[in-house]
């Protein structure tokens, strides 16, 4: 999302801000999921986003602004009110994606993660600061409790096999870029793990990543 912070990329911010102003406060019975980003926590606590948060100082807002006019293959105008990701929302989304296919076994890249973020934002209304993972090396666990997909390292041979034999993993050839964008040069793959709905592994292994109330 870093590229979204470039100067001259904020022309669509007015439309995003207007949508935030129009968004109704949602029921407080279901809090945001542990592990979501700052904007989602503000949405849950205040029912809106303080004006102090802008594309200039928040990567998720800048990411949304930079994709306002982008053709992404699904409705550009959000279909539902803006809301923070919840445990149930992440849990249900995980099972939907598992049953429909398309994410399990797909080689991870930042671009693919952004496509997923945009689709979830536009169709479900969940603010895109929920899909974050623990640092590497090794398996990366989701920070958002309820999201049941982790990122697991695979060998170049396995990535090559997936790219050649699995249509859903062939959007980009694994050998082209995957691994090079990772700090530890690992090729990562989305893998469904039902147990992540019972144990918040990220909070246990990396408590320093979570806001202390």
Swiss-Prot record:
Keyword check for Mitochondrion: no
Gene3D superfamilies listed in its UniProt record: HIV 1 nef anchor domain (4.10.890.10), Nef Regulatory Factor (3.30.62.10)
GO molecular function (one): GTP binding
Region: Mediates dimerization, Nef-PTE1 interaction, residue numbers: 114-130
Modification(s) after translation: The virion-associated Nef proteins are cleaved by the viral protease to release the soluble C-terminal core protein. Nef is probably cleaved concomitantly with viral structural proteins on maturation of virus particles.
Short motif Dileucine internalization motif, span: 171-172
Biological role: Factor of infectivity and pathogenicity, required for optimal virus replication. Alters numerous pathways of T-lymphocyte function and down-regulates immunity surface molecules in order to evade host defense and increase viral infectivity. Alters the functionality of other immunity cells, like dendritic cells, monocytes/macrophages and NK cells.
Family: Belongs to the lentivirus primate group Nef protein family.
Note: HIV-1 lineages are divided in three main groups, M (for Major), O (for Outlier), and N (for New, or Non-M, Non-O). The vast majority of strains found worldwide belong to the group M. Group O seems to be endemic to and largely confined to Cameroon and neighboring countries in West Central Africa, where these viruses represent a small minority of HIV-1 strains. The group N is represented by a limited number of isolates from Cameroonian persons. The group M is further subdivided in 9 clades or subtypes (A to D, F to H, J and K).
UniProt protein name: Protein Nef
Species, as recorded: Human immunodeficiency virus type 1 group O (isolate ANT70)
Gene this chain is encoded by: nef
């Amino acid at each position: 999302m870093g590229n979204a912070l470039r100067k001259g990329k904020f022309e669509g911010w007015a439309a995003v801000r207007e949508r935030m102003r129009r968004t109704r406060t949602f029921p407080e019975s279901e809090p945001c999921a542990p592990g979501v980003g700052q904007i989602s926590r503000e949405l849950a606590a205040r029912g809106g986003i303080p004006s102090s948060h802008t594309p200039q100082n928040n990567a998720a807002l800048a990411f949304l602004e930079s994709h306002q006019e982008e053709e992404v293959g699904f409705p550009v105008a959000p279909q539902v009110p803006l809301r923070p990701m919840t445990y149930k929302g992440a849990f249900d989304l995980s099972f939907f994606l598992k049953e429909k296919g398309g994410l399990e076994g797909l080689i991870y890249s930042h671009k693919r993660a952004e496509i997923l973020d945009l689709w979830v934002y536009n169709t479900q209304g969940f603010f895109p600061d929920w899909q974050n993972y623990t640092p590497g090396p090794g398996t990366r666990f989701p920070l958002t409790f309820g999201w049941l997909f982790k990122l697991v390292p695979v060998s170049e041979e396995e990535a090559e096999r997936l790219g050649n034999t699995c249509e859903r993993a062939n959007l980009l050839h694994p050998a082209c870029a995957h691994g090079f964008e990772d700090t530890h040069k690992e090729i990562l793959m989305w893998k469904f793990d039902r147990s992540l709905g019972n144990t918040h592994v990220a909070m246990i292994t990396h408590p320093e990543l979570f806001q202390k109330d």
